[in-house]
Amino acid sequence: MKLRQLGLDHWFEEHVHELCEPGQSVARVVAVDRDRLVVRAGDGEFYAELMGKFFYNAETAIKFPCVGDWVCLDHHDSEHFASIHTVLPRKNLLRRKTVGYDEEVQILAANIDVAFIVMSCAYDFHVNKLERFLVMIHEGHIEPVLLFTKTDLVSAEVLQMMIDDIQDAGIHITIMTLSNTTGDGLDTLRNFLQATKTYCLLGSSGVGKSTLMNQLMGEPFFDTQTVSDSGEGRHTTVRRHLIPLKQGAMLVDMPGMRELAVAEVNKGIEESFEDIIALELQCRFSNCSHNNEPGCAIVAAIEDDLLNIEHYDNYLKIKKESGHHKQLSFAEKRRKGKNASRLAPSKVRKKKMRLSEEDLEY
């Protein structure tokens, strides 16, 4: 497998010529095992260790390589072990707040093209949970796709009700459905995956991520387990691992997330709740607290059933949790919203979420 097939495009090649020393080679990190990493270059995987400078110079965990990164390295006497000298710049980064620690950030993966939010439509779905995933993904400048699994366990009417709940919350996202049991939707997913692109699977334990990986690989690479009657999943994936698929795409399987604490997510909040940002632009006063002020568009939209109260409460909760306390100025909101102030409240929820050119500048 050539490096281009692993996702090394012209953007990364420019940084290779700039940052890698003569005699060094390039590889992609496919897994992290405690104090050493597993990297892939060509058809083989081998271990690599970090040079000491990483531990002296890295100010935060973000500076260390993670799954999906491209690195410059040199080999030791054995071709099965190498030392990592440099981490190439990233196109994007997927991260979350470490559960139980207010300021620590956990790095999940880098250089992801599409993040699949995997939810079981039998017992795992909740709009607020979906919004949390979207905030994290949008903050990383990654395209989100919702993947409903276990559709064989619910009726078509129940599935449609879930989709309606998503639309009622003002969420616009590509939705795919499948059943690992019947095979429905698997061909659609396979056709969606593109060669040289990198995808990841995010979701709780027990939603079928490992089973799906085995389906896409055509072999039982990952162990799978059953789910309890309460819907509580069991961890089968214990580490993040980037796997090349037969059709040429790369897929990162993630351990199940029981809790999803978001890190500081300014962009992620703005993009995931842009309907609320658009309504704030319509308030009579720029410093409106959205409580009892006259001319408050937020209060009016809630009273007129144009804004889902749970959607708004989740926005406030995530905003507070992430440490996103700095309010945008009215002028900044104007620039962010652009044409949003011209949107009637009834149309706010139907406005499709897109990444702006500014957001795509990493």
Locations of regions flagged by a protein language model:
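N-terminal accessory targeting/assembly segments
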Residues: 1-127, 359-362
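Signal for well-folded cores of large energy- and translation-related assemblies
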Residues: 17, 120, 134-138, 152, ...
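Helix-rich effector regions associated with P-loop NTPase G domains
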Residues: 23, 59, 63-70, 74-77, ...
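Phosphate-binding glycine-rich loops and their immediate beta-loop-alpha structural context
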Residues: 108-172
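Catalytic P-loop NTPase motifs of RecA-like helicase/translocase cores
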Residues: 125, 154-155, 184, 258-261
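Canonical P-loop GTPase G-domain recognition
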Residues: 143, 152-207
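A conserved segment at the C-terminal end of the G1
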Residues: 209-225
